[in-house]
Amino acid sequence: MSSEDIFTIAIDGPAGSGKGTVAKELSKILNYHYLDSGAIYRVIALAIHNKKLEFNQEKKIVELLKEIEISFEFDKTFLDGKDVSSEIREESISKLASKIAQNQELRKSLLSFQRSFAKKPGLVAEGRDMTTVVFPGADLKIYLDASVEERSKRRHKQLILKGNNVNIANLETEIALRDKQDKERVHSPLLIDDEAHIINNDGLSVEETINKILALIN
């Protein structure tokens, strides 16, 4: 069955806009499958690392994609049935994932792999390119946005809870720079699809943001 036959919700937006949390919770409410494209690159990076491949061995990596199984369950990510949620956050894996994401041939190879997550009863997919490249025919496209100030406050709160005392002004500078880089990058820049519904969730809770999306579905 093709992804066009399955109700698909694609969510994009800048870093820190809450698209990951919203997408996960939305998939639970709808009982849909869930795809986190960022985690996909990390898991593939881990699989490449485990197989001792180089990221530029594209043919071998494409073959590897046919062999591995990636799945998501609530806040956990699995590779061939093993919980790798912590492993994929390691610095070495993050760096390799970034290299893979910048390799256009590998990005193209990953298209069909990502689209294979579209299964009945439906899919909630979040991440870069979801609305424009991976699922251009998605039934519902969401661009989740929030101001730099709002995203800085959220990030500051997260870091404080982890015991890290950081300057919120520095966070604002970092996030603004990340936005600029994401929008100006040559490959896969951050874009707002013409068909996307823009939701600014400044001051909104996760539940309130999800309710706005559910209203669009209904």
Where are each of the predicted segments found?
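Hydrophobic anchor at the beta1->P-loop junction of P-loop NTPases
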Residues: I9-I11
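N-terminal phosphate/diphosphate-binding loop that engages ATP/GTP or pyrophosphate donors
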Residues: I29-E90
